Swiss-Prot record:
UniProt source species: Eubacterium barkeri (Clostridium barkeri)
pH dependence per the entry: Optimum pH is 6.8-8.2.
Name this protein carries in UniProt: 3-methylitaconate isomerase
InterPro entries according to UniProt: PrpF-like (IPR007400)
Cysteines engaged in disulfide bonds, as pairs: none
Amino acid sequence: MSDQMRIPCVIMRAGTSKGIFLKGNDLPADQELRDKVILRIFGSPDVRQIDGLAGADPLTSKLAIIGPSTHPDADVDYTFAQVSITDAVVDYNGNCGNISAGVGPFAIDESFVKAVEPMTRVCIHNTNTGKLLYAEVEVEDGKAKVSGDCKIDGVPGTNAPELMDFSDTAGAATGKVLPTGNVVDVLSTSKGDIDVSIVDVANPCIFVHAKDVNMTGTETPDVINGNADLLAYLEEIRAKCCVKIGMAATEKEASEKSPAFPMIAFVTKPEDYVDFSTGNTISGDDVDLVSRLMFMQVLHKTYAGTATACTGSAARIPGTIVNQVLRDTGDEDTVRIGHPAGVIPVVSIVKDGKVEKAALIRTARRIMEGYVYVEKAKLV
């Protein structure tokens, strides 16, 4: 008998993230054992994740578990997990919008969904939130199309476009677009009171003014991640808000058991800044607001898909901190969010507190398929 388990595996780049895609029936049914297997697949806990497939970056330490739909209106079930790099934690408390963009193509290629040319619409049941997502995937020769002329900032080259619709994800974690009922709350912190907006669309997100955390909002990843005091303060705010909206009982529990969600971002009005990935200047005229999003206690080098849907929705709710810094876009439904590596546009329509549209364009590509091996002795 082999001393290693062999598990079918696919690695996909989805949006500006990269993840491991597994079928649910290829994993142990017991949750505790399943999480041990997942940690070994990724090589966690280890700062380098050297003994697993992950890449020692929060944006590549992501998992999608796919299975037949348990929802009457959906085509496929999808469970997302953020796998901690340094701790033995598999966080199922929210969804990843970028990884979601890989689910439709995976479902088509693995025959969970019948391929229809030239475009297949896949209804995805996200089990983390109980919400439905919709992916419009271009199809060619019975498989998800890869080549195309769609460029998304943060990914080299171009690929086939995919529309991801998060319009049905309002109140994903808390049941309400505004979990506290307020557009702005005043939070007591170790550095004094600070205004926060907590909005729950696709995933719950916390928004603060960049100036209130002594930042401009246009800083590069190195500057932000090198500021230990800032990182600690943002995590304090995030943990307090996590407790406030009922996602954790204590701040300690929020940091240890729900490190990924809710996310927190600091925002500012449109202005010029430098794309850290290319060195090019992004004009303030090309964005409607600028945001820096924290994820797993470090800066997200681009912008999370779910946070994009949430930020766009927050921008359309009068009085929120995001709305306060939003450029006047007139009748235009698209909100252009400036992030460290470019701009991400999102179609955002909110009327009378109801999210009518939250959609963005992503691309995805299957990189590898094969088997991942897990040492059985390490599962004890």
